[in-house]
């Protein structure tokens, strides 16, 4: 409720938290609220895979930031900027930890002064490839409203992936079960005595195991 109220009232706010804390649910609720208020909403993410995931969880089309800002490769610049801003009332950016300085600056220039911006991300996940730690620096600045979700919900607690993520974040060794033992877990460990063996194992997983289990290696990795 606090996150929804913040998003409804602030021009810029950050929603952050570790895996399983409800960022996805909260984002979906905020988008639904804005939609009910009649706002024109743009959903975006730094990568295509993250944009696809955002679209799946919100039920609304999402795109990459480059596509949202209409990147022109012939001129190596974005068409959308302060002179030609986005025709929206609100913007949601997921996986904001991957925002670098250039992309963040370009995005902010293209958002109308009256529009709202929600940045969603986890500073402990993938950082930007380019220069800058935009999300982390904004959080540390204490100049932007931040809602940090900390409670891990019951369904997430049952996930070994979530448990291992928190263990690693706290400097502890993760619990890894061998694939050969075939335990009922969502996090399996495939050891290899030599680097070459590891490469062959990865090839076998991508080419054989994943398709056999119904996963698309291109989209799922």
At which residue positions do the language-model features occur?
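Short glycine-/polar-rich loops that comprise or flank the Walker A/P-loop
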Residues: 38-39, 88, 113-116, 142-147, ...
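Conserved helicase motor core of P-loop NTPases
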Residues: 2, 6, 123-221
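Conserved lysine of the Walker
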Residues: 23
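Pre-Walker A (Motif I) flank of P-loop NTPase domains
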Residues: 8-15
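Walker A (P-loop) phosphate-binding loop of P-loop NTPases
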Residues: 20
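Conserved P-loop NTPase motor core of helicases/translocases
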Residues: 40-45, 49-110, 151-152, 161-162, ...
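Short, conserved "post-DEAD/DEAH" coupling segment immediately C-terminal to helicase motif II
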Residues: 101-115, 133-138
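Hydrophobic positions on the alpha1 helix immediately C-terminal to the Walker A/P-loop
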Residues: 26, 30
């Amino acid at each position: 409720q606090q996150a929804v109220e913040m998003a409804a009232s602030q021009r810029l706010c950050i929603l952050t938290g570790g895996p399983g804390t409800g960022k996805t649910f909260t984002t979906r609720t905020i988008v639904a609220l804005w939609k009910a208020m009649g706002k024109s909403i743009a959903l975006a993410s730094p990568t295509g895979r993250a944009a696809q995931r955002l679209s799946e969880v919100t039920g609304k089309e999402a795109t990459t930031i480059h596509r949202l800002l209409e990147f022109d490769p012939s001129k190596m610049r974005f068409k959308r900027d302060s002179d030609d801003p986005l025709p929206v009332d609100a913007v949601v950016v997921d996986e904001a930890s991957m925002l670098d300085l250039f992309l963040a600056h370009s995005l902010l220039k293209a958002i109308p002064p009256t529009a709202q911006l929600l940045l969603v991300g986890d500073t402990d996940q993938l950082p930007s490839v380019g220069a800058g730690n935009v999300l982390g620096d904004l959080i540390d600045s204490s100049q932007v409203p931040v809602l940090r979700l900390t409670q891990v919900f019951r369904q997430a607690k049952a996930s070994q992936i979530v448990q291992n993520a928190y263990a690693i974040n706290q400097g502890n060794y993760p619990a890894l079960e061998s694939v050969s033992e075939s335990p009922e877990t969502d996090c399996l460990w495939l050891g290899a005595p030599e680097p070459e063996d590891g490469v062959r194992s990865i090839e076998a997983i991508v080419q054989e195991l994943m398709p056999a289990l119904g996963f698309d290696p291109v989209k799922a990795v």
